[in-house]
């Protein structure tokens, strides 16, 4: 027995409704040509005009000229690479540092297999995954802060 009821096309009332076009979205403005020919180009040209206006009225300054003879004491990467930089800086063997970095995606791929019995999508009802992600976030923040400090204070964050 089917759960869903199939429409009876031999019903004259249903056939009359379908003949009038009811049940289809024929209301409102059509997308072609109103949106695609008129509204989209106006939005695109308006956005481009705003960008050009901002570039002319408030140009970005490039800063000081580079001096190749005055290098900083320690060159830092961009902020999003601080944890990776800290791992490579602290671990004595560089190959071990690269292996440690490959463990991160491998650990993320293992989470569904570790917690495969949990059917919930709510993160608060998935304690293993939540603990794993919170631990990873704390380690990433710790490594990122340590990368900003000198090498002798980077592991203790200058607290000890």
Swiss-Prot record:
Entry keyword Cytoplasm: no
Keywords: Electron transport, Membrane, Photosynthesis, Thylakoid, Transmembrane, Transmembrane helix, Transport
Gene3D superfamilies registered for this protein in UniProt: plastocyanin oxidoreductase, Single helix bin
Membrane topology according to the record: Multi-pass membrane protein
GO terms for MF: electron transporter, transferring electrons within cytochrome b6/f complex of photosystem II activity; electron transporter, transferring electrons within the cyclic electron transport pathway of photosynthesis activity; ubiquinol-cytochrome-c reductase activity
A Pfam family assignment: Cytochrom_B_C
Subcellular localization, as worded in the UniProt entry: Cellular thylakoid membrane
Signal peptide: none
Transmembrane segments: 36-56, 95-115, 128-148
InterPro entries xref list: Cyt_b/b6_C, Cyt_b/b6_C_sf, Cyt_b6/f_cplx_suIV, Cytochrome_b_C_euk/bac
Keyword Membrane attributed: yes
GO CC term (a single one): plasma membrane-derived thylakoid membrane
Swiss-Prot/TrEMBL GO biological process terms: photosynthetic electron transport chain
Assembly notes: The 4 large subunits of the cytochrome b6-f complex are cytochrome b6, subunit IV (17 kDa polypeptide, PetD), cytochrome f and the Rieske protein, while the 4 small subunits are PetG, PetL, PetM and PetN. The complex functions as a dimer.
Role description: Component of the cytochrome b6-f complex, which mediates electron transfer between photosystem II (PSII) and photosystem I (PSI), cyclic electron flow around PSI, and state transitions.
Family indicated by similarity: Belongs to the cytochrome b family. PetD subfamily.
Name used for this protein in its record: Cytochrome b6-f complex subunit 4
Organism, scientific name: Prochlorococcus marinus (strain MIT 9303)
Species lineage: Bacteria, Bacillati, Cyanobacteriota, Cyanophyceae, Synechococcales
């Amino acid at each position: 027995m089917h759960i869903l009821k199939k429409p009876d096309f031999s019903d004259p009332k249903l056939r009359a409704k379908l003949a009038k076009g009811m049940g289809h979205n024929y209301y409102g403005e059509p997308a072609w040509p109103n949106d695609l020919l008129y509204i989209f180009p106006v939005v695109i040209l308006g956005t481009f005009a705003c960008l050009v206006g901002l570039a002319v009225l408030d140009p970005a300054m490039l800063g000081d000229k580079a001096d190749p003879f005055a290098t900083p004491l320690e060159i830092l990467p961009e902020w999003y690479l601080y944890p990776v930089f800290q791992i490579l800086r602290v671990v004595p063997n560089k190959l071990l540092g690269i292996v440690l970095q490959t463990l991160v995606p491998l650990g993320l791929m293992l989470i569904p297999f570790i917690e495969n019995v949990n059917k919930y999508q709510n993160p608060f009802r998935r304690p293993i995954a939540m603990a794993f992600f919170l631990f990873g976030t704390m380690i990433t923040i710790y490594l990122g802060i340590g990368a900003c400090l000198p090498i002798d204070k980077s592991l203790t964050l200058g607290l000890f």
